[in-house]
Design a protein with these regions (language model features):
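Short cytosolic juxtamembrane segments of multi-pass membrane proteins
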Residues: 410-423
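Short, membrane-interfacial amphipathic segments enriched in basic
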Residues: 1-12
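Hydrophobic, regular-secondary-structure patches
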Residues: 46-140, 171
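Hydrophobic alpha-helical transmembrane segments of multi-pass inner-membrane transport and secretion
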Residues: 22-49, 285-320, 343-352, 398-402
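Short helix-loop junctions at transmembrane helix boundaries
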Residues: 351-394, 405, 409-413
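Mechanotransmission and gating elements of multispan inner-membrane complexes involved in transport
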Residues: 70, 182-184, 190, 195-291, ...
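Transmembrane alpha-helical interface segments in multi-pass membrane proteins
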Residues: 311-313, 319-365, 391, 407
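Beta-strand-rich non-transmembrane domains
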Residues: 137, 144, 161-177, 197-213
């Protein structure tokens, strides 16, 4: 170290300056360290949870969802015959229109979509509301009428099972797969018989063949899978009746363009997975902006701390600066001394922040939790992307360099004659 300083007098001078103000130097380093730690932890936590949600969403929902959109209610009968507001008319018992949710020619559309080389899988779907009864327990939920083999191609149903076997639905016509939360509410397990009642009042005896846990809280707490034919029976519909077509793509990033293409081609509403979850992605954007603002504020405050320390050193070391200039040191040399000091504070605080941020993220990621939000997580999901560490360290260096630049310029402009005369 001493040999290095002997060869590099500017480094030695900067070193002496920093250690002449140990307390202030340590406080400035701690400010940088804290900012970098918060940057790494918050970025890792937010992106970890967001990536986990996106992964779950991509694997458990359709990349493109085709359905018959329910249109707005028809105008009131009065408006057809009376177009002024100066009369009072009472109409009773106007019959509501029975909206047709069926996707007509669904099988033909599925056949055409299957031929699209961009498509990995396509499956019919029939969704309905129902009541689940098991003993004295009763829960409302949703029923997904599916072709279980096709559904597994899209959403890997078998991988999400925590008990039972989905293939039993092929040999057991009255089989049902319950979401884990729904099964817990009912107190039902594999092998139990439950009663399912539709909004039409049709009741079916079903046998639980499997329990599914996707990690998507709403699905696990309310959804059950049954065969497409049983769903049609519950709604008293024919074997061709479906309400939705779900599509899984080979490249999920093409979902928006393909959804628009299918909507134009087949005449039904087609929604890509990002549009379906637009509200959640909006929350993500707000979170990211908030955290970015907080992190920048912390690093800016630490930068002001470095600025104040260097300005204090400059005014205290004015005679030293005058002597250095009298010895032949140029303005650029004086500037370099104070820039070295700011970089030393920034790099040391940054490296300590990287270490503390990594340790904090590791420890927090190991704490067992049971969070039930959009998704269910047992532990906080932390993203250890190396780019976060590089960005945090780079930002620390930039902020401290900027903080040291102005004091360095001021020190370089001092006139040694004026300094000595004022003393």
């Amino acid at each position: 170290m001493n040999s290095l300083f002997s060869k590099r007098p500017l480094l030695r001078i900067a070193w002496v300056h920093l250690f002449s103000k140990k307390r202030q130097t340590i406080v400035a380093m701690l400010g940088v360290m804290f900012g970098v730690t918060v940057f790494i932890f918050q970025a890792g936590l937010l992106t970890g949870l967001q990536n986990y949600f996106i992964e779950k969403t991509v694997n458990t929902t359709a990349h493109v969802h085709i359905y018959n959109e329910v249109r707005t209610a028809r105008p009131h009968v009065v408006t057809r015959y009376i177009d002024t507001a100066d009369r009072w008319v009472v109409v009773r018992n106007q019959k509501p229109r029975d909206e047709e949710r069926k996707v007509k020619n669904g099988n033909q559309i599925i056949g055409l979509i299957e031929k699209d080389p961009r498509v990995e899988g396509v499956a019919p779907f029939l969704g309905l509301q129902g009541i689940f009864r098991f003993g004295m327990s009763q829960q409302a939920g949703t029923l997904a009428g599916v072709d279980i083999i096709r559904e597994n191609t899209l959403f890997k149903v078998q991988e999400n099972l925590i008990d039972g076997d989905m293939l039993r639905m092929e040999t057991m016509p009255n089989g049902i797969i319950l979401g884990s939360g729904l099964a817990d509410k009912l107190g039902a397990s594999v092998g139990n018989s439950i009663i399912v009642i539709s909004s039409k009042g049709v009741a079916l005896d079903m046998k639980v063949i499997a329990i599914s846990k996707t990690g998507i809280t709403l699905q696990d707490n309310t959804r059950a899978y049954i065969s497409l034919r049983n769903a049609q029976r519950l709604l008293q519909q024919s074997g061709s009746y479906i309400t939705d077509i779900n599509v899984r793509l080979r490249d999920v990033n093409q979902a928006q363009a393909i959804a628009q293409e299918y909507q134009s081609k087949y005449g039904y509403r087609a929604e890509d997975w990002k549009a379906a979850n637009a509200n959640v992605f909006g929350i993500f954007r707000i979170q990211n902006l908030t955290v970015t603002f907080v992190i920048i504020s912390i690093l800016v405050v630490s930068g002001f701390g470095i600025f104040n320390i260097l300005m204090t050193i400059i005014y205290e070391k004015m005679p030293d600066i005058a002597i250095l200039k009298a010895m032949g040191y140029r303005d650029a040399d004086i500037s370099r001394i104070f820039l070295i000091e700011s970089l030393a504070i920034g790099s040391t605080g940054g490296l300590l922040g990287l270490l503390l941020g990594f340790i904090t993220s590791k420890i927090v990621g190991m704490v067992p939790l049971n969070i039930q939000g959009f998704v269910s997580v047992q532990y906080l999901i932390i993203n250890f992307n190396p780019l976060f560490y590089l960005a945090a360290f780079a930002f620390a260096l930039v902020s401290t360099t900027v903080a040291g630049y102005f004091p360095a310029r001021k020190a370089a402009r001092f006139d040694p004659v004026e300094i000595i005369r004022s003393r």
